[in-house]
Every structure is written in C-alpha cells, then in structure tokens.
Amino acid sequence: MVVQEDIPMMELFRKSVNASREALTKVEVREELTYHYAIVRVYSKMLVTSCAIYTLLINGYPDDAMALCRQLYESLVIIDTLLKGKQKNDTELLERFMDAPVIMALRDDYETLSYALKHDPNDQYAKSQMKMLDQEIQKYTQKYQKDRIDAFKDYWWSGYDSFGKMAQQSDFPKGYMYSLLSDKVHMNALGAFLYLDNSEPGIPLGDVDGGKQQPLWYASLFLYCSAGIINDHYPEMCPQSVIDLLKQFSIEASMYMKK
C-alpha cells in the first residue's frame, strides 16, 4: 500500500528504473564472449529485480523488497568484478563467468539425479541421464582441473571461494549493509521478529503502509553506483541523463530515510 507521503519517492523510483531500462533497450546486444555482453546480462537482471522491488513496495511488502535489495548489491559487486577484469584484459575471468551458468546447471542436474539414484539405484531413466550428464561434466572438470562437479562453488568463476571474499576485493566491500539485507533473507531471529513497518502492534499477516524508506535507499544507492561504473566503460548503457536521474533518486531517498 502507498500512503500519500510515499507517492513522490515511488514515482521517482519508477521513473529512474524506466529511464534505465529504456536506455538499455537501445544498446545493440550480441550473444558473444565479450565483457560488453556479460555486463548487459547482469545489469538487465538488476533492472528486472528493481521492477520487482518497486512492485513489492507499492503493494505493501517492504521486508520482501529488502531481501531483493541484497540481490542488487550482489549484482553491483559482480559488475565491479567484471569491469576490473575488463581493465586487465582478463579473458580467462570472462570465459569462466560465461561458463558458470552452464556448469551450475550441470551441478544442479547432477545433484537431482544423484538423489534419485540414492533412493532407487535401479532407476534406468536416471542412470541413462547420468551417463549423458557425465560426458558434459567431464568437459568442464577437465577444462578447469576440478575433481568433481560439486567442487564448483557459486562464485568460483571470480577466483574467490565465496561471495564475501569477492566483495572484499571490490570497490564496494561487504559490510554492515549486507548484514542488514541478509537479515531479511535468512529465517533467523531478526528476520522473524523485526519488521521494517513497526507502526502497528502485533504480527503483520498482509500488506503494510510503512517501511519503504530503507529499501528505497538501498535500491537507489546500488543502482546509482552500478550505473556510474558502467558509464566509465560503456556510456551507451548508462548515459549521463540516466545517471543524473539516479543521482537525484539516491539523494532524495537518503533524505527520505532521515524523516
């Protein structure tokens, strides 16, 4: 739900994301092994996530929007890592990043089939699928000198064995902000008991009126930072007009947070 005082900020959020999406749709995209294509993929996902955050906020679900803000931060760190690789002309980093989705899909399929065979070792369909899967798996385990498919961790492509280590090497190190965002993702004590909207006593079982300040500020910050570093390399993706609008959004979201 949106109360009267939220309307200007929500409108600025919508306007900023729409301007960002419109600029990106004008960029020529070819599916190829380039940093340009890699950045387009991550940034486009970031804008789609921003649309989801807007939808959750306008319908009164700030805590769920906050959880998605963590995805924006993770996207920002990935973009920063890729752009640093571009500066170094690191073709191996790029290739690992582009191979990662295929490898992660193989890992998921392997775990699913392993589970099926564990419960029914005579499952002929699972056996035949596993045999075909093994051929694809060997191609990547040999290429990257891994013993097993499950040796590929989620952020292996970055050269670090965890997101935290990758973030610490970026210009946007993981700190208290990421911890606050994680509290809205993990079902821990904070996630269960602390709500962004605390205007009403009791446990909310539906949409709420308040709690939009923090998600708006996080979203504005991560979008502005991403657009800024992308503009340094690919100004056509994030033109100055978009950066100016995101800067305004970030400044006003910061002021809105202090109210």
Task: Name each model feature, range by range.
Residues L82, L93-I103:
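Acidic/His-rich structured neighborhood in mature extracellular/periplasmic domains
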Residues M1-E31, A100-K259:
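Secondary-shell segments that build the walls of catalytic and ion/ligand-binding clefts
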Residues L83-K88:
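Predominantly late transmembrane helices and immediately cytosolic-facing juxtamembrane segments
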Residues R70-Y73, E95-M98, K247:
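Short amphipathic alpha-helical surface patches that mediate protein-protein
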Residues A19-L82:
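Long, hydrophobic/aromatic-enriched structural stretches that serve as scaffold segments
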Residues Y35, I58-Y61, A65, D90, ...:
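Residue-level recognition of alpha-helical structural elements
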